[in-house]
Every structure is written in structure tokens, then in C-alpha cells.
Amino acid sequence: MIRALGSRGFAPVSALLEDVGSMFVLTGKTLVSAIRPPYPYGNEFVSQFLFALRLGWFPMIVTSVALAYGPAGIQAANFLNLFGALDRLGGLFVLAVIREFAPLVCAIVMAGVAGTAMCADLGARKIREELDALMVLGVDPVKNLVVPRFLSLMLVTGLFDIYALIFGTFGGMLVTLVNGAPLSGFFSTYFTNATTTELWGSLVKTTIFGAIIAIVCCYKGMTASGGPEGVGRAVNQAVVIAFLAIGAFNYVFTQALLATHPELSMVR
């Protein structure tokens, strides 16, 4: 009985570890398939790119401005006003928006709108046994279905990071104007702290976020079972796992960036 209870208690952990291992395997297969010719997924890549772009552009803009103006902007401005140093808001926005908010906003939006749609699409195909039919016909599902989604989501997420930086900065400008301060102080400290390393780090991190979302959502979709309810569970699990993976990678990437570039820890 004790052994049964123990195995039942460790079953979720074992299943999670098995999923993580399988996702790493899928990542390797995807990278190899993306590099190795032939490249039959051009039309599917364009279709998935436009699909993700159409779904995510408006939520991304709204979320970027809202988060930059609200939690980052208003709270930071209230704190700096206590010391009469509102001109330092631009430097803090580099730390908040470029390093954290912009990549995370892109990841949250793309996982919530594009990632779930990809998972549901592949899950429905799995339930209808379309994936098995493709393999019977000699068509590789990884090369023809996963690779275009993987590449398109990386590209769209990296592109959205640029827009998130622009609209996040716009939120900081609004906060500065609402507090009656000139924009010259905001831009002075903003451009003093916004180094090339910081910008490239934000872009690389966001692009990898897109890769993580694509792998997790494609894997959960291609392993869905149990009919329509199973597809719903797969979508739910994909979002949760993607957010956990993004949080873990974000911590590791940021710490590695600060360790290799300690000058980024200082607000000038």
C-alpha cells in the first residue's frame, strides 16, 4: 500500500520529467530537420507567420503600453518623485522594459494566442489520426508541421519585441508627461543606459522564448489523446509548461548576461 501511494505521488513528477525529456528530443529533431534539405515547408512557414502576426499584434501593443504605464511607470515615478529624481525614470525603464517587460509581454501574448492555436490545431489533427496518415504516406510531421511553426514563432516573437520596446517606451513617456516633467530628462537617462548589449540581449531572449513556446505547444498537440477533452487538456498544459519554462530560462539568461556584463547592473 505504501509503495502504491508513493508511486502515485511521484507519478506527476515522473510524467513531467518524461515530457521535458521528450521536448528536448523534439527540439533536436526540429533543429536537424530545419537545417537538412529539402525545405518543403515554405508555404506553411509563411502561413503560420501571418497567422501568428494577425493574432498577436493588437494584444501585444495594448499589453505593452498598459504594463509599461502601470506597474513599471506609475510605481517607479511615485518612488522617484519622493526624491525629486523623476529624470531617472528613463534609466529604470531600460532595466524594466528592455530587459524584462518587453520579452515577457511578447512571450505571454504569443503563448496565449498563437501557441494555444498551434497546440489545438495539431491536437485536433492527432485526434483525427491525420499525423499517423502523414507518416504512412512518408511525410515527416516534424519537418512539415513543427519546423514551420517553430521558425515562424521565433521570427514573430523577435519582431514583436521591437514593437514592445517602442510601445513600452511610449508608456514611460506618458508617465513622464502625466507627472509634469519634461521628456528631455527621461530620454537622457534612457539612452545613457540603453546599450547595444542590452538591446541584443532582449532580442535574443525573446526569440528563444518563441522557440520554447513553439516546442512546448507542438509537443503537447502532437501527443494529445482522449478526444476533444484531451485536446483541451493539452492546450491547458502547454500554456502552463510554456510559462514555467519561460520563467526558468529568463532567470538563467538574465543572470548569465549580468555575470558576463557586470556594467549592466548599474543605472547611470
Residue ranges, per PLM feature:
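Hydrophobic alpha-helical transmembrane segments of multi-pass membrane transport proteins
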Residues: 89-132, 160, 216
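Selective transmembrane-helix segments that form parts of the transport pathway or gating/packing helices
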Residues: 53, 57, 61, 101, ...
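Hydrophobic alpha-helical transmembrane segments that constitute the membrane-spanning cores
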Residues: 66, 106-111, 147-176, 208, ...
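Short cytoplasmic-facing helical segments at TM-TM junctions of multi-pass membrane proteins
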Residues: 122-147, 228-231
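Active-site cofactor/substrate anionic-group-binding motifs, chiefly glycine-
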Residues: 40, 48-105
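Membrane-interfacial helix-loop-helix connectors in multipass membrane proteins
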Residues: 74-98, 166-207, 216-235, 257-268
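Membrane-helix cytosolic exit motif
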Residues: 221, 240, 244, 248-262
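Short, membrane-interfacial amphipathic segments enriched in basic
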Residues: 2-45, 220-225
